[in-house]
Amino acid sequence: MEATNTREALGNSIDIWCPIINDFQENEQFFRSREKLGEQILVYTCLVPGGKWLNRTLDMEKIRQVYFGWGGSKYNTLGYLHWGLNQYKANPFNQSVVKHPSPAASANNYLPAGDTHIIYPGANGPLSSLRFESHRIGSEDFEILEILKRKNPK
């Protein structure tokens, strides 16, 4: 599996592609050509993208998490690679923006709010969030849309 923006140099080295969602849309022709060779496509988000693109950071509308499922069905991707379920670098109730953990990151490099987690720590186990539930709804919608496409493949 490849989850970076590297494409051409990898050639026939991998069979599952996982571009950042905007990279997939901007280079869809490349990924469709790989799909014709029997390779699979998922999408993911990590730090970016922002703006008009789908992501799951705290500052984005919750409907965007639902749209991951709808977009997956529309663009016929295999799914969404989830990162950051509970990668707390600090107490997420007190600090939603944390320094980037990479030693190569500059002193001013911070992760977007909520990038490290989509659930919260609770005294008796994890606590859900609106972002997590919105993404779940989108995943369920994806399954329903795929069933409808199989029943009516037009």
Language-model regions: role of each:
Residues 1-6, 77, 93-154:
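Catalytic domains of carbohydrate-active enzymes that cleave complex glycans
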Residues 1-94:
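Catalytic-core regions of glycoside hydrolase
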